[in-house]
Every structure is written in C-alpha cells, then in structure tokens.
Amino acid sequence: MELAIRTAMRKLGGSLLERLLALDTGHRSQRIDCGSGHLAEFVSYRTKTLDTVLGPITLNRAYYHCSDCASGVVPRDEELGVAHTSLTPGLAAMADRVGAAVPFSKGRDLLAELAGLELSTKRVERCAESDGKAIAAAIDTYAACAGT
C-alpha cells in the first residue's frame, strides 16, 4: 500500500511542479542580451521535457535567437539549471550520488528500485562524469588561487 501511495504522490508532485514552473515561461521582452553582447530576438515558445525526481514534466519556454552569434537563448533553462540537459539539478544530484557509489548499471537499478525513477545506465554515467569534471576543475581553480 505504501509504495502505491508513494507512486501516486510522485505523480501528483510532478503535476504540481509542472504547473508551478509553467507560471513563468521565461519571456522577458522582445529582445534580450544573448550573453555575448548582442541582442537576441524572441522567436516562439518551445517545449522541453525534463526528467525530475518526480518523473517527467513538460515545459513551454520562450526561445530567442541571436543572428550575430547564430545561436539560441532560452532564459528559463538557464534559471532552472537545465540548459543543455534534460535532467533537473535534483535528479542529476541523485544520479551523481549513485554513480559515484556503485557501478553505473547498479546505480540505475537503485534509482528505479528506491525512487521509482527510470534512467539509462549511460545517463547515470554521463551525469557522474560531468560532475566529476566540474569538481576537478574547481579543485584546479582553488589550487591555482592558493598558489600550489
């Protein structure tokens, strides 16, 4: 019974999270700074499916395009920490933790068994490796600043 309630609560939580995040689409104005000193123009709203600790959700976000840089800008993705990824920071942290503790395939199994979350072995591996690289870069920066 408790696992059935957990599953129902996770679905309810995912629905609530999706609705809360939908309140802000990321549309700031017709033009925004692209991050490289140019102006990116609003083009349209685009959908993105995110994998969260509450299951998958879909967001509708404002998409801007910078013709000078020939690249897209999605402010809401930056704000939510999901630019260039479909894993939310919460789920990424869980995948990092299991990926650092056990072999990646076992980590995938643990996420499914303990949290009801389905990720591929490769996604657990990529997540753990990405965080490992970020930690190594932070250590290198700290060492350079400390003069060692």
Where do the model's predicted regions map?
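Short, conserved DNA-binding cores of transcription-related domains
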Residues: 1-63, 67
